[in-house]
Amino acid sequence: MSKAIKLPQKLMLLGSGELGKEFVIAAQRLGNYVIAVDRYANAPAMQVADFCEVISMLSADDLEAVVTKYQPDFIIPEIEAIRTEKLQEFEDRGITVIPTAAATNYTMNRDRIRELAHEELGIRTAKYGYAITLEELIAVSDEIGFPNVVKPVMSSSGKGQSVVATKEEVEKAWNYAIANSRGDSQKVIVEEFINFEIEITLLTIKQWDSPTIFCSPIGHRQERGDYQESWQPAGISEDKILEAQAIAKKVTDALGGAGIFGVEFFITKDEVIFSELSPRPHDTGMVTLISQNLNEFELHLRAILGLPIPKIEQLGPSASAVILASEKLDAPVFTGIAEALAAPDVDIRLFGKPTAHPYRRMGVALAKAENVQAAREKATDAASKIQISSQ
């Protein structure tokens, strides 16, 4: 792609959640037109886009209709549940799919990306197996051993994951994974439980005409398979950072294209173990809204458009903490914002989701401090001050 790209470009976002919303804001700051597409109305990114459409992204006919209507220059998937074979058709017709149609197809399913990393590229991963029935899951779990981790091969933001400590918990894990599976899949992956010191996300920026570059690693903590807090810098050794960068480059080079990739690793005392990869901004990377001179959404946009990224500057110890709903609500209302913002170097992002349900991520608190622990405490404290209720 030429570095002399002309603006504005017409960008179609498939999936319009909170990550998409921040991407739209970044895109519009450079004057681009954005069409936000999702399966429900008034999704976060739709609230700031130029145009929006509600479709089933698993429907080839629906995808064809919106692409024909808008004729985008770029198609940018933000979620996993998309009819990915249709993206290849669009790419063949000259539309740029980010990072590529083939890469999107690989990364929409945990089984494909795991096989690429482990079997084709020889990268160390947790031991794993697959199951498409409860009986198969019981057998594979016995083979992998306990504890293990059960996940849908396709899900959104870590939904459907559970740690299985004993054979008696396998059926519950199966039901939870299938209930939270996205798309057509009824397949789960079973992974060896890694006794890690820290989980990290390495935001990896693959460019059309320039070398791959990296953000400072981001540490994160999960519950129920979903991120609860993240922090930067992660506080791991330089040799492990270099090893993670080498692995991330190897995988993203195999996938091709351009854009930001969220590459997740388990860091143990002695090893750097590849976990997962998302070919888009990562939820744990929301900390970059406060921690970097260019956040992950701006970096994604620049990489997509072939614009230069001369410097990524980490601005000091920073953290994010999620703001979760605790009950089912229509038109949720937020209080405690003033209290949350009373501390210095704290910011709040409310995503504008039209409804709430237990554990739904409704916003994020961001904080900077003199060290990472203080930043984490400040972000968590700010998030705890925000209450969500009905009107």
From Swiss-Prot:
Its EC number is 6.3.1.21. GO terms for molecular function: ATP binding; magnesium ion binding; phosphoribosylglycinamide formyltransferase 2 activity; phosphoribosylglycinamide formyltransferase activity. Mg(2+) binds at E264, E276. Keywords: ATP-binding, Ligase, Magnesium, Metal-binding, Nucleotide-binding, Purine biosynthesis. GO terms for cellular component: cytosol. The keyword Protein transport does not apply. It comes from the Bacteria. It catalyses: N(1)-(5-phospho-beta-D-ribosyl)glycinamide + formate + ATP = N(2)-formyl-N(1)-(5-phospho-beta-D-ribosyl)glycinamide + ADP + phosphate + H(+). Pathway: Purine metabolism; IMP biosynthesis via de novo pathway; N(2)-formyl-N(1)-(5-phospho-D-ribosyl)glycinamide from N(1)-(5-phospho-D-ribosyl)glycinamide (formate route): step 1/1. InterPro entries: ATP-grasp, ATP-grasp_carboxylate-amine, ATP_grasp_subdomain_1, PreATP-grasp_dom_sf, PurT, PurT/PurK_preATP-grasp, PurT_C, Rudment_hybrid_motif. The keyword Ligase applies. Coiled coil: none annotated. It is an enzyme of class 6 (ligase). GO terms for biological process: 'de novo' IMP biosynthetic process. ATP binds at R110, K151, S156, S157, G158, K159, G160, Q161, E191, E192, F193, I194, E199. Residues 115-305 form the ATP-grasp domain. N(1)-(5-phospho-beta-D-ribosyl)glycinamide binds at E18, L19, E78, D283, K353, R360, R361. Homodimer. Belongs to the PurK/PurT family. Involved in the de novo purine biosynthesis. Catalyzes the transfer of formate to 5-phospho-ribosyl-glycinamide (GAR), producing 5-phospho-ribosyl-N-formylglycinamide (FGAR). Formate is provided by PurU via hydrolysis of 10-formyl-tetrahydrofolate. This is Formate-dependent phosphoribosylglycinamide formyltransferase. It comes from Trichormus variabilis (strain ATCC 29413 / PCC 7937).
